[in-house]
Amino acid sequence: MKNTAGILAIAGMLIAPLAHADVILHAFNWKYSEVTAKADLIKGAGYKQVLISPPLKSSGNEWWARYQPQDLRLVDSPLGNKQDLEQLIAAMQARGIAVYADVVLNHMANESWKRNDLNYPGTELLGQYAANPDYYSRQRLFGDLGQNLLSASDFHPEGCITDWSDPGHVQYWRLCGGAGDKGLPDLDPNNWVVSQQQAYLKALKGMGIKGFRVDAVKHMSDYQINAVFTPEIKQGMHVFGEVITTGGAGSTDYERFLKPYLDNSGQGAYDFPLFASLRGALGYGGSMNQLADPGAYGQALPGNRAVTFAITHDIPTNDGFRYQILNQTDEKLAYAYLLGRDGGSPLVYSDHGETQDKDGLRWQDYYLRSDLKGMIRFHNAVQGQPMQLIGSGDCFVLFKRGKQGLVGVNKCDYEQEYWLDTAKFELNWYRNYKDVLDQSAVINVQSQWVRVAMPARRPPLAAE
């Protein structure tokens, strides 16, 4: 079979997507009205969930300002208000797409540059609410907007994290930016704080939100996570957090942070162990054998807990994590592997050039790339089909999804050939398997042995 880029994605018989097809579009820092306007494009590309930026009260045009809450009791930010969010949810529901919300529960906005107290939202915003009561009452999710939500007694003492290897330190003190920055006021999970955060989550759930990405969950104690996320709130919801680690089982940060979170919360998480496996396998000197079965060695999360990814918003936007950015071809190979394999909910990151000064517009409208849409079609077509490893080596990994699909990822600069024994690895005979990235490339099984050619630095994904 001839093909062109390290990916072979061959699918036989384009079967109807199953109801639980689950690719998530991370519409990072998109205005809510933009998500609504692009609803048909999102549906047409095959996404089943959309993750939106935090729906709360925040100010400032920078992306990071969305992660500095001023008030949880209403939705009003440069990205949109409650009416915009309602329209977004309605548009997605009409197209069978679930909406997930990024939620910030660890801290509040750092406003030490303009005031000395810890009353939130504070005198300035309370004055704005009072001056325009009709508007702000329409943005309200819960609570009394005539008084503050939080006071100094609802926060841990002032102080910055200095020991990033100590969970107690990381979960008690503040995230700070250095150079005298006082940091993000860290919430104390007292009864009042917990009750207000529960009210916030219940209000979003009542609006039709179907999942929560818990921001900065690494900085929240097990007690706080389990106190806030009651069985009632979690019922029918996809809840997952981002705990950045450098690897899986055996790595210090996994054992101290991610493993306890998984063991004690019952929630899902970004699959940083698998991401580390991808980076290692695709990197110089790495072997694709690492991707044959990483979960068997604790280097991938269980599929029912994992949100898999090739990049998250924290990686390009934080200097300390930028070393994890894959080169553009490797990122494409990573997506092919993630969207071809069984296990986890793949997340696709798409922004508006928030790191344009360093990366150009690399991820702007990424969600609409034609090759990515082909991979998503493959993912949806083979969803629920069992995964079976066929072979792997330093350059490639090759596996099948039932009899419907075949995935090969070749990281090397030259073609990889594999003779597939169809008596051992059953495929449908006399049916065309077409590469979803190159429709002219076809495999038709007519004998026991079939030659599979995995082109250089390109992932072929073939479906019947």
Swiss-Prot record:
Protein name (database record): Alpha-amylase
Catalyzed chemical reaction(s): Endohydrolysis of (1->4)-alpha-D-glucosidic linkages in polysaccharides containing three or more (1->4)-alpha-linked D-glucose units
A GO biological-process term: carbohydrate metabolic process
UniProt lineage: Bacteria, Pseudomonadati, Pseudomonadota, Gammaproteobacteria, Aeromonadales
EC number(s) from the headed UniProt entry: 3.2.1.1
GO molecular function terms attached to this record: alpha-amylase activity; cation binding
Pfam families linked: Alpha-amylase
SUPFAM superfamilies per the UniProt record, alphabetical: (Trans)glycosidases
Active site: D215 (nucleophile), E242 (proton donor)
Signal peptide per UniProt: 1-21
One GO CC term, this protein: extracellular region
Annotated InterPro entries: Alpha_amylase, Glyco_hydro_13_cat_dom, Glycoside_hydrolase_SF
Site entry: Transition state stabilizer: D314
Record organism: Aeromonas hydrophila
Chief location bin: secreted
Cellular compartment(s): Secreted
Keywords noted in UniProt: Carbohydrate metabolism, Glycosidase, Hydrolase, Secreted, Signal
Record-stated family: Belongs to the glycosyl hydrolase 13 family.
